[in-house]
């Protein structure tokens, strides 16, 4: 038994989509979450800067005595995950491979779309992972740089959001049967995305898919939390306005949480 928390990092609130699934599947595990909303989005930033910011988030989580770190951010996974994983002596998990694997299982026509930040799409990481496992699958990647700002400003239900999503996704409509939401912010726009793509297109939430891998690693390293613990205390930190973070989190997690401000 290991009652230390699992650490989650993201460029903002998007990683809460992963946390929500973890709380559902593994309610006995403690969580420490850090969202760097003050510097979001990461996607348009240079690689060197993304790596620097990611290490700051990692080092913060290490001060919280975490037993595992989850990169609940596709951009950080694409740029810094391998380096951080090699440097630390605790398990470090990214969201890309679980999402890629789920897309392969989902597609019936071998036509997969991937949407993400400019950096995630430019890295070509999803296409590489998908075609490594299933060379015959065709992958169409599309950067959607306007999606993260919509979520971070809590405008997911606005008419502006609907127009931006419609305009952004039009190149993929009618061309794929599976769409990977290659940014953990994007599930917060899921209803609009599904409406634009149509009911026949299966949406893959890369963040939610990685919770299965978290469970596997907890078992493999024998670091599961206390299954009998009913009241688990989670901690949430943001580099921006805690009230906005709390408002979005309460909608997604369906519970009120305390959010602390931190300066990195």
From Swiss-Prot:
Q: Which InterPro entries match?
A: Asp/Glu/hydantoin_racemase (IPR015942), Asp/Glu_race (IPR001920), Asp/Glu_racemase_AS_2 (IPR033134), Glu_race (IPR004391)
Print the keywords alphabetically.
Answer: Cell shape, Cell wall biogenesis/degradation, Isomerase, Peptidoglycan synthesis
Q: Where is the signal peptide?
A: none
Known catalytic reactions: L-glutamate = D-glutamate
Q: Which GO terms describe its molecular function?
A: glutamate racemase activity
Its domain of life reads Bacteria
**HAMAP family per record:** Glu_racemase
Q: What is this protein called?
A: Glutamate racemase
Q: Which organism is it from?
A: Streptococcus pyogenes serotype M5 (strain Manfredo)
């Amino acid at each position: 038994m290991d009652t230390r928390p699992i650490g989650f990092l993201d460029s903002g609130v998007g990683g809460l989509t992963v946390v929500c699934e973890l709380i559902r599947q593994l309610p006995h595990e403690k969580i420490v979450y850090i969202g760097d909303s003050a510097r979001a989005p990461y996607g348009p930033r240079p690689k060197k800067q993304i790596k620097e910011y990611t290490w700051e988030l990692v080092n913060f989580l290490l001060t919280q005595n975490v037993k595992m770190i989850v990169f609940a951010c596709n951009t950080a996974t694409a740029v810094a995950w391998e380096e951080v994983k090699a440097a630390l002596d605790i398990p470090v998990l990214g969201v890309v491979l679980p999402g890629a694997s789920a897309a392969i299982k989902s597609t019936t026509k071998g036509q997969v779309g991937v949407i993400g930040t400019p950096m995630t799409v430019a890295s070509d990481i999803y296409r590489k992972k998908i075609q490594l496992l299933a060379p015959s699958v065709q992958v169409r990647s599309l950067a959607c740089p306007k999606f993260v700002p919509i979520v971070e400003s809590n405008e997911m239900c606005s008419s502006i959001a609907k127009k931006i999503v419609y305009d952004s996704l039009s190149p993929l409509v009618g061309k794929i049967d599976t769409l990977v939401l290659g940014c953990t912010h994007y599930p917060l726009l899921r209803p609009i995305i599904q409406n634009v793509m149509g009911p026949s297109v299966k949406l893959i939430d890369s963040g939610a898919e990685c919770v299965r891998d978290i469970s596997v690693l907890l078992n493999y390293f024998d670091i599961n939390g206390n299954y009998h613990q009913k009241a688990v205390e989670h901690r949430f930190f943001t580099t921006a306005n805690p009230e906005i973070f709390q408002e979005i989190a309460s909608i997604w997690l369906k519970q009120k949480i305390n959010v602390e401000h931190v300066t990195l």
